[in-house]
Amino acid sequence: MEMLQGLLLCLLLSTGGAWASNEPLRPLCRPTHAILAAEKEGCPVCVAFNTTICAGYCSSMVRVLQTVMPPLPQLVCNYHELRFTSVRLPGCRRGVNPVVYFPVAVSCRCALCRRSYSDCGNLKSEPLGCDYHTSQDSSSKDPPRNLTSPSQLPEPADAPLVPQ
């Protein structure tokens, strides 16, 4: 009987470990697929393209007595390694460079937010997209005619970053 109780105890403890797993409930900071949009003055077409961004959760702490102690620095999901690639905007006026360069996440890490190259604000209520104030009446609910359909999204072509 004592051996059976020991076996039962081991079984319960091992199962409890599976329930209380170390895995987080939210995805950690990692490269994630995203669809972004690019537009440029002098180019009539907004182009949506596939890329990889850094997204996910980083561990953070908040002090209980915030008035007595300074706030703790909060970590955010940042690029660790990145490469640059480009997308070509069609139909640009003569003299306008149709190439738009953007970063592609190779790896990500939790670090302090650097405002020099990151948007440190809250999540946006609307996804990133093109500005249609000049090309469409604001009362219209129809989608813009000049946005590439999702089935025709270009994959970014690898290109070295060339200074303009």
From Swiss-Prot:
Its job = Stimulates the ovaries to synthesize the steroids that are essential for the maintenance of pregnancy.
Q: State the oligomer form and interacting partners.
A: Heterodimer of a common alpha chain and a unique beta chain which confers biological specificity to thyrotropin, lutropin, follitropin and gonadotropin.
Which superkingdom heads the taxonomic lineage of this protein's source? Answer: Eukaryota
The name this protein goes by in its record: Choriogonadotropin subunit beta
Q: Where is the signal peptide?
A: 1-20
- At which residues is glycosylation annotated? 50, 140, 146, 151
Q: Which organism is it from?
A: Aotus nancymaae
Q: Where are the transmembrane segments?
A: none
Which cell locations does it reside in?
Secreted
Query: Which Cys pairs does UniProt list as disulfide-bonded?
Result: 29-77, 43-92, 46-130, 54-108, 58-110, 113-120
A Gene Ontology annotation in the biological process aspect, one of them, is:
G protein-coupled receptor signaling pathway
Region feature (Disordered): 133-164
